[in-house]
UniProtKB/Swiss-Prot annotation:
The species this protein was found in: Androctonus australis
Free-text comment on this protein's domains from its UniProt entry: Has the structural arrangement of an alpha-helix connected to antiparallel beta-sheets by disulfide bonds (CS-alpha/beta).
Chain positions listed as propeptide in the UniProt record: 72
Tissue spec. comment: Expressed by the venom gland.
Localisation: Secreted
PROSITE patterns (UniProt xref): LCN_CSAB (PS51863)
Protein name listed in UniProt: Probable neurotoxin pcD-993
SUPFAM superfamilies, A to Z: Scorpion toxin-like
Superkingdom of this protein's organism: Eukaryota
Residue stretches making up the LCN-type CS-alpha/beta domain: 21-72
One Gene Ontology MF term: toxin activity
One Pfam match: Toxin_3
Alphabetical UniProt keywords: Disulfide bond, Ion channel impairing toxin, Neurotoxin, Secreted, Signal, Toxin
Length: 72
């Protein structure tokens, strides 16, 4: 049983664990990036920062803001 645990732990270290998250795209001063209803600017900005895609979230708490999916 101990060998199974040790082998599983070793595999996790060798394979590595990569996590992604969703969230708002922010400027250096930690303010959200506001957008128009067009999502093209958000998609480009999010992809530039390592996300898989981005869109404009209209009428959110912070106003119209860029939402990124799969940020690294």
């Amino acid at each position: 049983m101990n060998y199974l645990v040790m082998i599983s732990f070793a595999l996790l270290l060798v394979i590595g664990v990569e996590s992604v998250r969703d969230g708002y795209f922010v400027e250096p001063d930690n303010c959200v990036v506001h957008c128009m209803p067009s999502s093209e600017m958000c998609d480009r900005g999010c992809k530039h920062n390592g996300a898989t895609s981005g869109s404009c979230k209209a009428f959110s708490k912070g106003g119209n803001a860029c939402w990124c999916k799969g940020l690294r």
